[in-house]
Each structure stands twice: as C-alpha cells, then as structure tokens.
Amino acid sequence: MDFKQYSPEELKECSMIEVVHSVLGDKRQATTFNELVQEIAQVLGLSQEQVNAKIAQFYTDLNIDGRFINLGENRWGLRSWYPYEQIDEEILPQPKPKKKRKVEDDGFDDYIEEDEDFDDADVTEDEDDDVEDLDKVLEDEDGDDDDLDDLDEDDDDFAEEELEYDETEEEEEEEL
C-alpha cells in the first residue's frame, strides 16, 4: 500500500496495526519489532514521545491480532505467509548442544558390590548389641518418672504459695 496517496488526516485515522499489516505485506519478509515501530512512526509522522506512549498497546494488539505471528527473536510476520506445519518448526527454539562437564576425581575408588559371605557369628553379635541398646532405652524411660514426680511436687508448692497469697490479699482488704 502506498501511503503517499493518503492525506495526513487520512493517515492519522489509520491504526498502527493497519499500517504494520500493509508494511509487512509490501516487504514480504519478517521484520523485527523495533523496525516495525520505526516504520510506523515514519509513516504516521509520530514523535518519539507519542510512539513511547502507544508502544505497549501496539505490542498487545500485535499479539492479539490473528493476522500476525511472532517468529521468535522478536521477529514478526504475517500468518498467511506460513503454512501451519512450517509455523511449528520456526517457532520452536533450536536445541543448543550441551557442554560436557569434566568428571572430577573424588578421591574414592569405585566400589563394586559383590556377594559377600557373612558369618553367622557377626549377625548374632549385632543382635546382642541391639538388645543392649534396647535395655538402655528402657532404663532411661524408667528415669523419666522421677522427672514427672519432681514436676508434681513443684505444682503442689505453687498451689500452696498461691493460696497463701490469696489469704494475704483478703486480710489486707479487710483492714481497709
């Protein structure tokens, strides 16, 4: 579309999306977003301040409008240029080869598990140790009762002190 044939008033009535559609149609190749914005500003005669004020809405409109497609790397084109199968291929990012890490030596030898024959004597010693550990735990639990008895005595002492305090308060109130 030749914009020279339009008067400045007619150009001001054109939306930015209409201008981009005709610019991309004339170019017939994908263009970066920044280049599109510069061309719109040139065609419509917009100042940099006006462009900055409208750029967010323009980008939103460009994304929403079904006639345009983002081809990655901030390049835009017309959807009609690309068959559906080709669109998927262009949008997908190219896989980057992964860098191989150097294997660091941890200073340990790799241990290969083998079936080892265990003696029955080793197993019974471990069981004896487990029984002794269990006996220690049970003894410790018996000692916990002593701690509870101490807490009960502390509660009793506190209750007696509280009772004495209450009686002292009552006597002071009676004196007044």
From Swiss-Prot:
Region annotated Disordered, chain positions: 90-176
GO biological process, one term: DNA-templated transcription
Keywords attached to this entry: DNA-directed RNA polymerase, Nucleotidyltransferase, Transcription, Transferase
A Gene Ontology term for the protein's cellular component: DNA-directed RNA polymerase complex
Keyword Transcription regulation: no
Biased segments, Acidic residues type: 106-176
Pfam families per record: HARE-HTH
Superkingdom to which the source organism belongs: Bacteria
Molecular functions per Gene Ontology: DNA-directed RNA polymerase activity
HTH HARE-type domain: residues covered: 14-81
Role played: Participates in both the initiation and recycling phases of transcription. In the presence of the delta subunit, RNAP displays an increased specificity of transcription, a decreased affinity for nucleic acids, and an increased efficiency of RNA synthesis because of enhanced recycling.
Subunit note: RNAP is composed of a core of 2 alpha, a beta and a beta' subunits. The core is associated with a delta subunit and one of several sigma factors.
Similarity field: Belongs to the RpoE family.
UniProt name for this protein: Probable DNA-directed RNA polymerase subunit delta
